[in-house]
Amino acid sequence: MKQELIDFLCKKSVNFSDEPSFKLVSGRLSRFYVNCKPTILHPRGMYLVGHLVMEAVKEAKLDGIGGLTFGADPVAMAAAFASELMGCPIKAFSIRKEPKDHGIIKWVEGDMQEGERVAVVDDVVTTGGSTIKAIERARSQGLEVAKAVILVDRQEGGLENVAKLVPDASAIVTRAELLEAWNKLKK
């Protein structure tokens, strides 16, 4: 299943360039760019992501799974759907980029209660900034962040930064795995 996801990502979501031409959130230019949305929002990609994320969190005894909108949303929803299919339902939630300014003011959207155990997910990690923001906001709403799962680790220190806040942090796929598959596909 993991190799199928890697191949799917290479076909739908990964771009490489000889020169640094892809602007990252940090503002830095990179030769490697991955936009996971075309993969995750495809029915087969959603199935693969959901099941692989659930495999990564199955021992954590979670109540919820979510992260910062929009990158984490399809990952969390795929995992929540897969959790129901697997007979161990876990609720999805989304963390706003800006707090809701009307009604009940809050960062977290979804059926989550203070004290519940959650995993924070993200589609891609470079520096870890977005994932760390999600962890901090989830904790500020009283959620216990027990695990962090990243779909693609660019292997630029972000996963290690996340692990400083959530020691149980892991990635489903690494940049090295994508590069290896990309090179095989291009031969």
From Swiss-Prot:
Catalytic activity of the protein: orotidine 5'-phosphate + diphosphate = orotate + 5-phospho-alpha-D-ribose 1-diphosphate
Species, as recorded: Desulfatibacillum aliphaticivorans
GO molecular function terms listed in the Swiss-Prot or TrEMBL record: magnesium ion binding; orotate phosphoribosyltransferase activity
Record: residues binding 5-phospho-alpha-D-ribose 1-diphosphate: 96-97, 100, 102, 122-130
Function according to Swiss-Prot or TrEMBL: Catalyzes the transfer of a ribosyl phosphate group from 5-phosphoribose 1-diphosphate to orotate, leading to the formation of orotidine monophosphate (OMP).
Known partners and oligomeric status: Homodimer.
Pathway(s) it belongs to: Pyrimidine metabolism; UMP biosynthesis via de novo pathway; UMP from orotate: step 1/2
Requisite cofactors: Mg(2+)
Domain of life from the UniProt record: Bacteria
Sequence positions that bind orotate: 126, 154
Enzyme Commission designation: 2.4.2.10
Record key words, sorted: Glycosyltransferase, Magnesium, Pyrimidine biosynthesis, Transferase
Name of this protein: Orotate phosphoribosyltransferase
Protein family per UniProt: Belongs to the purine/pyrimidine phosphoribosyltransferase family. PyrE subfamily.
One record GO biological process: pyrimidine nucleobase biosynthetic process
